[in-house]
């Protein structure tokens, strides 16, 4: 949570917090990556790897303006940079490659069957990126901007998730899923 600068690992069956990483600089998104946890840090403008076994921390990639959501993408990671309007691939060595640019405030990301889905926070557009082509597949109510530059770009992440054949869209202002 960016409010308390923690990333917590929780057992979903009973809600037990099994590990907590404290003192992070505005963590806004996290995902399991190999044997570690990848975290998008708005305050550091970076993606950090946390090792649950040892507690070690390592910056994997930096130089972002507003890293917003990090997910697994094939064997790598992708992160949305809301301010730059980019989706960036990060390999295991921290090398970055811009996959998509020219977006309007990319926030939530989801990946399935060689397609990457992107929620544009300012427009409400849900975009699909596949075979180097991008298309709008849906539009919902856009999100809101942060109240100050010290806060992450989106106070509430406009997120995406895929389960089975369905894409789930969390709408901040609509308060819907």
Regions found by a protein language model. Give the residues of each.
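Sequence-structural signature of mature extracellular/luminal beta-sheet repeat domains
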Residues: 1-177
